[in-house]
Amino acid sequence: MKKVAIIGGGISGLYMASLLRLNSNYEVSIYEKNNSINLEKGYGIQLSVNSVKLLNKIGFQNINFEEKFFPNKVNFYSLKNKSKICDLDISAFNSHEDRYTTLQRFTLIDFLRNKIPSNLINFNKKVIEVQSESEITKVIFEDKSSIECDYLIISDGAFSKTRSLIANKEIKPSYFNSIAVRGNIDQNDLWNIDHNNISLFLGSNLHSVVYPVNQNGQFNFIAILRKKLNSNELANYSLFNNDEFVSSTLFEISKQVDRNIVENLRDIKCFPVFVSTEIFQPKNKNIYIIGDAFFTFPPTFAQGASQSIEVAHELYKNFENGNDHFNKERIKRTKMIDRKSKFNYFVFHFSNPLMIFIRNLLMRYLVKNNRFINSYVGKIYKN
């Protein structure tokens, strides 16, 4: 039996552990630096069909219907003209059970956590050293404890310390010249939008998204605002909890986004957006990286959670097939999604009136062009 150690108890780490527990050839444990799994309620995530199909293999379809929502389309709105541009039918990629799903992040994390016996999740385990010169990898933690494993899977987020340790250099994501504002809002406080689907609002150097996260009228709101920050501001993470900074950011957003939405947001959080600039692959064939530690995407194709699940599943299949590392197709696919996400960001944030007019005109045509949709969206949703 091979021992597998997973560093990080987020979506990718928990899902990977759930898969490995299906195979009696592996003994798996999770090591989380925090004192608990983050089960904070409220904030939403989107899961496209490519990840829902994989989650359903471990029983995701059995989650209480009330805790999920199944939007059929994305409605695009112009913040400048306060009008609808067009809509994209995302249900075209659905099957009977594999449907585009929105839900609270808590719901997914709780589902995955309950797949893992509590004694297999170890908390307060901050990695300070990785020794991997031999077939057996040794991991040393800050509390002076250590473990040995046959396979080490790193899934401790975009700012993965473990990834930097095995690379013998600091690997950090780059600031995307944007900040995000996230919050919750009730259906009763959302006027003049389709409550049964995803609403995407395009503005000047700004876009925002509103979508239901369950069947009970709760919605997730997120806005991405272009904003340059200097190195001192980025180093001072308390800045994003500063009431004055958050208020000024909300004021900036309210210049374009419906003030009624901004004024009725709850549980507001503000944070900088970071993205990956490279894909780092360990030289040691027994060490793997998944989730945001593998690659962090811009938040403009709603693929963060879906790709974490997809990459973990591919690694599991590689384990079963005896492959050492992700193949070239995975690298190619990651770069393709990254390019499209960056292109979306560029197009969503147009300021020039002529460019906005041309964009809106093209969008109305392209969302009805099946060949384009199958190429641009289908290549991601239909893995």
Cite the ranges covered by each PLM segment.
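Conserved N-terminal helical subregion
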Residues: 2-4, 21, 48-186, 228-233, ...
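Residues at the starts of beta-strands that form the adenosine-phosphate
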Residues: 3, 26-27, 218-221
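Conserved mid-domain beta->alpha element of the FAD-binding
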Residues: 5-23, 153, 181, 245, ...
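Conserved Rossmann-like nucleotide-cofactor binding loop
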Residues: 12, 36, 159
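Glycine-rich FAD pyrophosphate-binding loop
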Residues: 21-41
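Conserved N-terminal glycine-rich FAD pyrophosphate-binding loop of Rossmann-like flavoproteins
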Residues: 36-54
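Conserved FAD/dinucleotide-binding core of flavoprotein oxidoreductases
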Residues: 86-100, 104-109, 189-267
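C-terminal auxiliary extensions adjacent to catalytic cores
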Residues: 363-383
